[in-house]
Amino acid sequence: MAFINEHFMLNNETGKHLYHDFAKDMPIYDYHCHLDPKQISDNVACDNITDLWLSGDHYKWRAMRAQGIEEQYITGDAAPLDKFKKWTETLENSVGNPLYHWSQLELKMYFDIEDLLTSDNAEAIYHRANDYLKQHHTTTQSLITDSNVNLICTTDNPTDDLNYHDAIKAKDGFNTTVLPAFRPDDVFKVGDPAFTDLLQKLENLTHPITTPSDFIEALYKRIQYFHDKGGRLADHGLEEMHFEAYTDQAIQDIFKKALNHADISTYERFQFQSYMLNELSKAYYERGWVMQIHFGAIRNNNTKMFEKVGKDAGFDSIRDQDNLAYHLNATLDMMEQEGHLPKTILYNLNPIYNDIVGSTIANFQTEPGIKSKVQHGAGWWFNDTKRGMLRQMSSLADQGLLMHFVGMLTDSRSFISYSRHDYFRRILSSFIGDLVEKGEIPNDDQLLKRMIENICYNNAYNYFKLI
């Protein structure tokens, strides 16, 4: 029997039933990813597995470095076949890592290859995969369509023109809805060059910015621009969740320092972060948006490699922080007190905080008619694993209502990462099936069908209301 077979990851009979009868064929609602809208719009031809597999994939790059592979085969200019062979050498030694599962799933799902990839057959599989891509005229749009994706939300800078989203919408024959999502990370980097650069770009698009009010007004204009283009989600990447009380005068002083390139203290940065989250949440709430917050990554930790290959290259890790429970609750409470807490999804990168997040969101489920208004987001990045998914779902089941979980997202730059939805659905089905067979969940097919289909698709569809 092939390693990737119909019962892969399904370790109980109920789980097999739940996956095959309820989960497997549900469409995909990918509400957070990093796909390039230009590549979708241009319907780029995909004719080389190395480009699909290794381009921009820092998960694989980390593993290759752990294997001792030279950088020229990772982020360098080595030939595609040579890079593929080096990845294969790494993959053979990645047993136990989800990369092994994902890669074999992708070979099966997108190339119809069931063989285990090894150094002995690497070159043959490389050519088989490339031939398959060419014979099937594979493109970015065909990969999305074949993956049964109904909706994609990309990740977009506040100053992006979103023209590619318009172009995608105008295309005939491509039925997946592709919408922008507002990602204003640089607004929190007060005192950094990225903040100054954002101010200049915003001024070019809106109006002169000399005060915090000018800044907020400019951002609100861009939020409305995204709204007019169909965007209904925002996402924020924060190193820490940290609340500090502030006054209008304090924010004005901090902003003036930023304009004058003066030093800004850590305390002032956190005051400004609290201010920005609060001001942005007003605009999101007024427009019925969903606010996402990803927190807990410490980035670019290897200075030598950052200077050599740049950011997002596989040198980030999980961080910890003091007093998270207070800071998280205080941030949400600020918005709740002022009457503008939007639908919110919290993604913690450090899994030891699962129960803190779970117990926090339960404090703010106070808007009648919205099921689990504040969500505990799916296992993210370093938790995008069997163990990470199970820990997140177990904590959510303990602390909240798993039945209303909005489920999986790819959070990926790869057009063949939709295998991760299948991976999640297998793990979910096996997890629920195991609880059924232990007598902890009723063996009621109507109940189980509703739970599986809700988590796989229906909850996201009803929560985001985008299509």
Curated annotation (Swiss-Prot):
InterPro entries: Metal_Hydrolase, Uronate_isomerase. It is an enzyme of class 5 (isomerase). GO terms for molecular function: glucuronate isomerase activity. Its EC number is 5.3.1.12. Pathway: Carbohydrate metabolism; pentose and glucuronate interconversion. It catalyses: D-glucuronate = D-fructuronate; aldehydo-D-galacturonate = keto-D-tagaturonate. Keywords: Isomerase. Pfam families: UxaC. GO terms for biological process: D-galacturonate catabolic process; D-glucuronate catabolic process. The keyword Disulfide bond does not apply. Disulfide bonds: none annotated. Belongs to the metallo-dependent hydrolases superfamily. Uronate isomerase family. HAMAP family: UxaC. PANTHER family: URONATE ISOMERASE. This is Uronate isomerase.
